[in-house]
Amino acid sequence: MKARFLLITFVLLQALLLASCGAGGRVGALQSESQSVDLADVEAVSVKIDFGAGDLRVTGGAEKLLEADFTFNVDKLEPAVTYKDGALVVAQPDRRGVPNFLGILNFRNEWDLHLYDEVPMDLTLDVGAGTSNLDLSGLALRRLNFKLGAGESAVDLSGDWERDLVANIDSGAANLTVLLPSNVGVRIIVDRGATLINASGLTKDENVYTNAAYGKSDVTLTLGLQTGIGWVNLEVEDSAAANEYSVTE
């Protein structure tokens, strides 16, 4: 099963890497650039990240709405950043076509995105393939939609949430780890395919997983999880706060 998954993932990853470079894409000199977006006078923002393939990192801690570093060696992978009326889009413009296959061996596409912590945010991510590390624990998220094609991803939703969060993760041929909070209620509804699920620190009732704080805290994180093939690791963060909701005999 594991060998079959790795083979399928490899094939899908290569296909998505090829498609992500666009028609006629060629590996060239390594380029690095930084971009930032100021936060306008808005009460909330929507952020959409459209990433074809490579290595993606998203976290908080920015002084502006966005502080980003991009590294790539295919011209067609140069990202486009737009912002208007509270809507931020960071996108790889051309994800179609098949480039020179030989160049794919030296393919590099790396995005390091820092977002502002304090503004309420609806976040949408569409990731084709590769590795993604999403540390969202410090953001003021209201909604999260994450679509992952193939590869590996770690999503950190731990921390002290001050408002309810509605999240959805849809993964294809991927290995996914989700770190969950211990001191706010968590409810996960799973619609899975040929996926192995490890749920540490959660209680299972058919296709629903909950943590010890569910139904007892003022804030609830609700996660819908759709999976294809691969494995999913659901972990509740280690915290002394978890003991507050633990039942002792």
Task: Describe these PLM feature segments.
Residues 22-24:
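Bacterial signal peptide processing site
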Residues 94-113, 124-126:
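A cross-kingdom signal targeting lumenal/periplasmic-facing segments of multi-pass membrane
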Residues 116-120, 126-129, 136-143, 147-150, ...:
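Extended beta-solenoid/beta-helix repeat architectures
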Residues 8-16:
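Hydrophobic helical h-region of N-terminal Sec-dependent signal peptides
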Residues 1-8:
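Bacterial N-terminal signal peptides that target proteins for export
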Residues 18-20:
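C-terminal motif of bacterial Sec signal peptides marking the signal peptidase cleavage site
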Residues 31-40, 68-72, 77-82, 87-104, ...:
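Short, surface-exposed interaction patches in beta-rich subdomains
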Residues 41-65:
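Post-signal-peptide N-terminal segment of Sec-exported extracytoplasmic proteins
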